[in-house]
């Protein structure tokens, strides 16, 4: 059953229904669901689907020829077109009479083996775009290649595409649709552990407990997720060992460049190059205090929940996992889950605020959200605010997010109010998010203060 991606499907269907030549670029990280999306889109449509392989031009030409002949004759035959230009031009001409979708999946594999492919496509698009009803879809997992060689203004295909779709992980709300049998708390835990990548979500069975799922995936040497982060890095980057060391450092608490470099044992400038690649892959993110531009106080954190969970808990327990001691390893992980979920809950709360804004239900019309941290000059102590979103230089919202088993009390609100003064906004709306709800005193305060909004987690899930 296909779940989600309604916006992307609508975009593809609008292109298809135009009846004229269309050229869409679909890209995103591995396991993100590109092929599943396209397969769902082309159901009941005239389509030729070709998947490139990491081989030479001859092999890929034979494969695309087979795909074309299978479409035209119903069966694949042995003869191949003499060139990619001949093969793709044949499809362009077929599409002069009827609507056809041509999908070139794993395009970077083919383009690397056939250096002239991009220029060939440019030539054919320019020649047939006014007469052919072809809908061409290029799909690729190599983010850097798709952005530099297909979408960049320097690329031969620049200016030819009519749409581009960058597939991102599912949001928390979208991910919850895969876990209908879970309680609200279990849904949050599942999202915090596997994130929003469809292939990772599918490894969890919502008819089994979170504990059983973790044991059967992350703590099982024969499971897909057990070696997935390392395997994915091997496919995407050179020197995966250094990348692994950097992600491990970040997942276990190092956030500043100097701390990461020290833990990895490499120069900070060297680490910066590797971190840039990890940011492009959507595995980590760079943060600066809200409202500031580039800052020496910038920090780095994991943006992909599955990577964060894996690097936080799996490497240190390799030996035990290899010996089948999943129960013992989970007993070591469990006490840290509440603390681990703190950052996940902040992300869930930020997503909730965006949903409220888009639904016209947020009192502050912010354009961005982020964390803020800095020094309280009065106390000389470090202060942090989980979420800040400004409407203008005078108006903002601030939020505190608590994933604990205790109800949030007035002390948390008072701390948030005091810290918000460090930002300098005149008009502030305060949000408190809580896994376990609020004390009566806190509820009474919210009823008396329209600038205070309490959001229990059960309201968000």
Please report, for each region that a protein language model flagged, where it lies by residue.
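Phosphate-binding site recognition
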Residues: 1-331
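A cross-kingdom feature that marks ATP-driven nucleic-acid transaction machinery
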Residues: 290, 299-461
